[in-house]
Regions:
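Charged C-terminal helix
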Residues: 172-207
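Short pre-catalytic strand/loop immediately N-terminal to key active-site residues, enriched for Gly-Thr
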Residues: 128-140
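Short, charged, surface-exposed loops that flank catalytic or proteolytic processing sites
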Residues: 88-94, 156-164, 182-186
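N-terminal loops that bind phosphate or other acidic moieties
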Residues: 63, 124, 157, 181, ...
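Glycine-rich phosphate/dinucleotide-binding loop and adjoining beta-alpha-beta core of small-molecule
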Residues: 1-131, 203-207
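Short, small-residue alpha-helix embedded
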Residues: 82, 138-169
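Feature representing long, continuous alpha-helical segments
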Residues: 97-100, 127, 146-147, 160, ...
Length: 207
């Protein structure tokens, strides 16, 4: 996405999508910055913003005021530190309030990832996710979460439910495989493997 023509092409591609997950594997190149800016300004579908897209936004917070449609952000503590210009220690002192402040300030759903993930909505409602384990603090785990949330966003058409259910399902998938991997052996693909078990459990329960 390097010029007006490619930006227009991206806008056309967005027209067939029901939701967009942007950030994982993106980098902070000039092309990536233009892509993030184009998506935020033009997308007329819900967005899930993660990883490098958050890092790009942290250098220009005005971008987060550009969105037309519902947005879910999924920062870990380091990304939230850059977004809020606060130390990780300060965030951890009152993580629930920080998540709520960010959600309200930018009119987004904030999924702030920590040992207990906080989901905060702009209307003040908050959830604390109790599924998951320390083995999930592994490279790519957050990418899996953003993908789950994006998929649920399309199915449920509800940003709050997509964020809260997504965090719970992601954690539950990690719990499902913990006995086989332990806390040190778990990798992101193990969490994906655990999703099969989660969906089977959900279907058996009729939900």
């Amino acid at each position: 996405c390097t010029d007006i023509a490619s930006a227009k092409a991206l806008e056309t591609e967005l027209e067939w999508a029901d939701a967009v997950v942007i950030g994982p594997g993106l980098s902070k190149s000039d092309n990536a910055k233009m892509l993030v800016e184009t998506v935020l300004k033009t997308a007329e579908i819900p967005l899930v913003i993660d990883a490098d897209a958050l890092n790009i936004i942290s250098d220009n917070m005005i971008l987060l005021n550009e969105h037309k449609m519902p947005v879910i952000v999924t920062p870990h503590l380091g990304e939230m530190s850059r977004l809020m210009k606060k130390s990780i220690a300060n965030i951890q002192e009152d993580i629930i309030s920080v998540a709520g402040e960010f959600a309200s300030l930018y009119n987004v759903i904030c999924v702030l990832k920590d040992f207990r993930t906080i989901i905060a909505a702009a209307d003040g409602e908050k959830f604390i996710n109790l599924s998951g384990n320390c083995g999930m603090a592994t490279a790519g785990s957050g990418d899996v979460l953003s993908g789950i949330v994006g998929g649920l966003l399309v199915q449920l058409r509800d940003t709050k439910k997509a964020a809260a259910y997504g965090a719970f399902i992601h954690g539950l998938a990690g719990d499902m495989v913990f006995d086989n991997t332990g806390s040190y052996g778990m990798i992101a693909s193990d969490i994906i493997d655990g999703l099969d078990k989660v969906w089977i459990k959900v279907e058996k329960n009729g939900n």
